[in-house]
């Protein structure tokens, strides 16, 4: 039931691909509660997915950005602050990808080039994003930055493969950068793990 919990709050939501995405569902709820946001995803994902439908439904704009590119992230933040005429209140990082999982590589036989690419997209991108936000002083005080993690960052889930390592690094970045964001900017940084969902990076796992 809408009660405008996020009225006048502005932000960025990463990772909405289609209506099965957690980021998509989050965007719908944020809109329902009165929040406004810019939607973003990698350019190829924007072309493949149906994010424009979500933008229309939530009265949002779409700014494509490669989360592994500082230039793209800088442009995204600049465009967002220009759109809202000021700083923002929240960011959702809902990004994850493992080529090793998609290619069926066992954890004991990983392709390390794929491992590095997946780590860069799934975890290092969170540091890049916060670094850009921090350097541009883009967050309002008492704002919130949230990234999606998974319990495999702390426990053994063999089929989650190298994504478990990516999520562990993601959580470490949240703690480390969260210290500086909290101390200097009074901004909260957290990760959250869904209880049950179908992960698009893990086609062999349903409702993990």
Listing of model-derived features with the role each one plays in the protein:
Residues 3-39:
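Canonical Rossmann dinucleotide-binding motif of NAD(H)/NADP(H)-dependent dehydrogenases/reductases
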Residues 10-14, 88-96:
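Conserved hydrophobic beta-strands of the Rossmann-like cofactor-binding core
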Residues 16, 21, 96-183, 196-197:
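Catalytic loop of short-chain dehydrogenase/reductase
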Residues 35-49:
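Conserved glycine-rich Rossmann-like NAD(P)H-binding loop of the short-chain dehydrogenase/reductase
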Residues 55-71:
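Rossmann-fold cofactor-recognition segment
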Residues 68-82:
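Conserved Rossmann-fold cofactor-binding substructure of NAD(P)-dependent oxidoreductases
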Residues 188-195:
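Conserved SDR Rossmann-fold cofactor-binding beta-strand/turn motif
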Residues 198-204:
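Conserved small/polar residues in nucleotide/adenosyl-binding loops
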């Amino acid at each position: 039931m809408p009660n405008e919990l996020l009225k006048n709050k502005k932000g960025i939501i990463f990772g909405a691909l289609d209506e099965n995405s957690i980021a998509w569902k989050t965007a719908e709820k944020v809109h329902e509660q009165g929040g406004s946001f810019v939607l973003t995803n990698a350019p190829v994902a924007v072309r493949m997915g149906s994010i424009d439908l979500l933008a229309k439904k939530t009265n949002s704009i779409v700014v494509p950005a490669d989360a592994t590119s500082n230039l793209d992230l800088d442009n995204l933040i600049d465009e967002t602050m220009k759109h809202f005429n000021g700083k923002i209140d929240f960011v959702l990082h809902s990004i994850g990808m493992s080529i090793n999982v998609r290619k069926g590589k066992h954890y004991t036989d990983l392709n390390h080039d794929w491992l590095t690419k997946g780590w860069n997209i799934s975890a290092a991108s969170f540091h890049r994003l916060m670094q850009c936000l921090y350097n541009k002083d883009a967050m309002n005080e008492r704002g919130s930055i949230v990234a999606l993690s998974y319990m495999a960052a702390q426990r053994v889930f063999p089929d989650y493969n190298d994504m478990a390592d990516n999520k562990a690094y993601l959580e470490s970045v949240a703690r480390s950068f969260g210290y500086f964001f909290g101390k200097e900017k009074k901004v909260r940084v957290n990760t959250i793990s869904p209880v049950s969902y179908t992960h698009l990076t893990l086609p062999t796992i349903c409702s993990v």
